[in-house]
Design a protein with these regions (language model features):
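Beta/alpha (TIM)-barrel catalytic core signal, keyed to glycine-rich beta->alpha loops juxtaposed to Asp/Glu
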Residues: 5, 10-179
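Histidine-centered active-site/metal-ligand motif
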Residues: 2
Length: 179
């Protein structure tokens, strides 16, 4: 289930997942963007119907630690579920892209998914401090941010985008610094 829908009975959504797996249209069941209580119901319902929830996908990065703070990482661990992090680079904030302001053509400049007014002086200073720390570690900010997300063995995968092969190669270097 890609997104928790408070307007649809959770039992109905979970039964649909059970039916999809049992019919062979999917191999496994997973959830995405579920709050703690809804995830607890989902884990229990699916397990009771012999279709265990194998993953929970949530936004997770150095600037957005809700899955950790709200107990969702621990909950996944307790239920034998994997955890997939999306937006590990905070829509580009945890890269060198915004270190010198908002570049033309960037997400923030387009004011689409990343609003310019979210880029407060405090946030930009925090990102600058993180960048200096990454530099001291011999990493780019993006590499350090990805390594930070991957440091927890509960994180089974991250969803990361790259606009070039060079960017992808650089991001892959983060796996050398997860220990």
């Amino acid at each position: 289930s890609h997104r928790y829908d408070p307007h649809t009975p959770l039992e109905e959504t979970m039964q649909a997942l059970v039916d999809i797996v049992r019919s062979g249209k999917a191999l496994y069941a997973g959830i995405s963007n579920y709050p703690y209580e809804a995830a607890a119901f989902a884990y229990n319902y699916l397990l009771e119907h012999d279709t265990p929830c194998l993953l929970h996908q949530l936004k997770y990065n150095m600037l957005h630690r809700n899955p950790e703070n709200e107990g969702l990482l621990a909950q996944a661990r307790e239920n034998g579920s994997g955890f997939i992090a999306f937006s590990p680079l905070a829509q580009g904030l945890l890269t060198d892209r915004y270190l010198n302001g908002v570049p033309e053509g960037s997400r923030a400049a387009r004011n689409f998914t990343l609003k310019q007014d979210c880029l407060t002086p405090e946030l930009l200073e925090k990102i600058g401090r993180l960048n200096r720390l990454a530099d001291e570690r011999g990493q780019t900010l993006a590499q350090m941010a990805l390594a930070w997300v991957l440091r927890d063995s509960m994180v089974t995968s991250v969803i990361v985008g790259a606009s070039s092969v060079e960017q992808l190669d650089s991001n892959l270097q983060s796996i050398r610094n997860t220990g």
